[in-house]
């Protein structure tokens, strides 16, 4: 189930991202508490962001959201590692794309994160390319949902 992000969720999101295994899988740096809170304050203040908390049986299991970057709506999500493999990402993404009608939606995933690539494909995203920023060791798979 998706719901609006509540202030108490931010501390839970911090715990989720403070996991080196999950951080490596997502190719996203672990932030200290101050940087994490500042990051979420910026997210929630940005009117282009549509952020949701992912809840299962009353427990926060992750978050999903989209934002506008370079004129394109990009989507991202995070599932706490202890909840991986239970279908939360697929259900959340399916619900999210049903809620957010704007198309196309874009996603970038570290190429080693095959689980996330599968989730996006199940929800209709197609691989449209690959990218690697200068100096960044992580190659990304670029996906798009058109309909």
What are these regions (language model features)?
Residues 21-41:
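Conserved GNAT-fold acetyl-CoA-binding loop/helix
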Residues 42-48:
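Short loop/turn motifs at secondary-structure junctions and domain boundaries
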Residues 1-21, 25, 51-147:
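Acyl-donor (CoA/ACP) binding surface of acyl/acetyltransferases
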């Amino acid at each position: 189930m998706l719901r609006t992000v509540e202030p108490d969720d931010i501390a839970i999101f911090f715990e989720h991202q403070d996991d080196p295994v999950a951080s490596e899988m997502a190719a996203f740096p672990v932030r200290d508490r101050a940087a994490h809170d500042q990051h979420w304050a910026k997210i929630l203040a940005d009117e282009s962001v549509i952020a949701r908390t992912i809840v299962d049986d009353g427990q926060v299991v992750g978050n999903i959201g989209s934002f506008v970057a370079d004129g394109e709506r990009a989507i991202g999500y995070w599932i706490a590692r202890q909840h991986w493999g239970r279908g939360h990402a697929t259900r959340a993404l399916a619900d999210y794309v049903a809620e957010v009608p704007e198309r196309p939606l874009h996603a970038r995933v570290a190429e080693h994160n095959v689980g996330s690539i599968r989730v996006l494909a199940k929800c209709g995203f197609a691989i449209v390319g690959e990218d690697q920023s200068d100096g960044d060791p992580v190659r990304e798979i670029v996906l798009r949902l058109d309909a």
